[in-house]
Structure formats: structure tokens, C-alpha cells
Amino acid sequence: MQTPNGILPIDKPAGWTSFDVLAKLRGALGTRKLGHSGTLDPMATGVLAVFIGKATSAADRQLDHDKTYEATIRLGLRTDTGDVTGTTLETAPVTVGERELRTMLSRFMGDRMQLPPMYSAVKINGQPLYKAARKGQTVERTPRPITIYNIEYLSSPAPDEYTIRVACSKGTYIRVLAEEIGAALGVPATLAALRRTQAGVFNLKQCHTLPEILAAAESGELETNGWVLPIETVFAPLLALHVNEGVKAHLLNGCPTSHYKAADGRYRTYDENGTFLGLATVEGGVLKVEKLFCERG
């Protein structure tokens, strides 16, 4: 099959790392030019946006990095990883329940500081924290700013387990949030399950399972079934700017266009035929290319 250029939202299966998913797709799609935005822990499932071909250069230019998760917290247990896959560090009887949990969830909303966990890809002095953690080492870390936009109670799937929905900013560790919630309740806590339902502009409704995608790639249907979204999808929050052939030529050659009548700001640009060109900015009536995603020819 011809390698597509675009973004493929996947419902990541449990037990796979984000890198595992890319490795599997490289063989199926016949390209090594793949990337993703927003790593998911192996135990987690849900939205993983895979960037293919020319779209890989758009991964680090995402405008919306906010995420939404459904997380199940198990009270009475604390592990070294912050989830049930880790080694047990502490157990304790649980004397609180749904009522207490509902009462205190709102205190976690808003801007706050969060200490990244040892089992994370955060780098200190050039080394990922998880490598030190696997050696039994603890590295001094600095709390980072995060925002919890919304947090709500959903259900209790098992005794001492509670599922919540969290809408948060990039860099929020739900494993740490689970432990913080437990501490506020006066009991140890860990993450029992995690599902990402939204990542930026991508949601579960756009996602397909890995087996579905592999089958479509093998049959050739992936080229025509619309599962691979256009590159500009990731820039949907920006206003669209349609330019004439003269301005298009300037953009393709990296030349600014003066006296351009558009409000200052950042735009996704299209030619007169509706072909996506790339990103451009307008400042003081001057239109400049920021990043091209189309062919120059």
C-alpha cells in the first residue's frame, strides 16, 4: 500500500507501550516515519494520535495539549509505580467511601503544582527518571505547574475502587493525582485503570483498534476509508485563511506578503483550490509562512 500522510487516532490496547504501537505500525504501513503525541502508560488504554509521513512534523506543533481521562482509583494500596502494576509498598484498611470522595474532589480543580513520579519519562540531567527508579534510586524533582479543568465522580466498579473523569493540562500525571486523592482521604491509593478519552482535538469516536487498523492496512482499505485524518486536523482551533496564487507563491518561496488585510494572528492557510499549504502568521499587515506541509512544486 502507498504510505499515507496524516494522523491516525488509535485506541491503544492495554499492555502495549506507545512505542510498541509505533513499532507494529511501521511494519504494517511500510514506513519508519511515524510519531505520536502524548505517551500513554502500558496499562492505559484510549486515544493515541499517530502521525504518519509528512504529518510527523506537525506533532510538536499541536495547539491543544489538554487531555481527558477516566481513571479508576483503588483505595487502601500504595505501590512504587503509582499503579497496580507496581510493587506493593503499603496496604491499609479503608474507612472512607463514595460520600467522602465526592466531597473532596473539587479541591483538586484549578492551577496547582504536581511532583512528577519517579516512574516517568521526565528527564533530570539528561536521564529519564524511570531509569533511575528501576535501579532503586530516588532523584530530587521539582514540582511542575498543571491545571485540572474539571474532575467528577463516575462510579464504583468494585469495593474500594472509584472511577473519576479528569480534564487536565499537558504534563498531568493521573497516577500522582490518584495518590494525592488518597492522601486527602487519609488512606493510601493507587491507579487501578486508566483510559484516555480525549487528547487535544482527538477523541475516542475517531479511534479504531490496532487489529482493525492492521487489517485495513493489509487489505489496502486504509488508503480510502477515511481513518487517516488530514494533517490540518491538528490545527483545527486556528482560523482558515484562503490565499490567491500570488500570495501562495510568496508562501511557498518563504517570502513575506506586505499590506495583507487580515487580523494579527496565526492561521492555517489554503490555496484557491482548498489545498492545505501550512501555517502562517499575520503581524502588522505582513503575512509570513511559519511551516509548510505541502509540496513546493
Spans of features found by a protein language model:
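Catalytic cores of RNA-modifying enzymes
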Residues: 1-170, 174-208
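Accessory RNA 3′-end/elbow-binding domains used by RNA modification enzymes
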Residues: 1-13, 19-36, 40, 44, ...
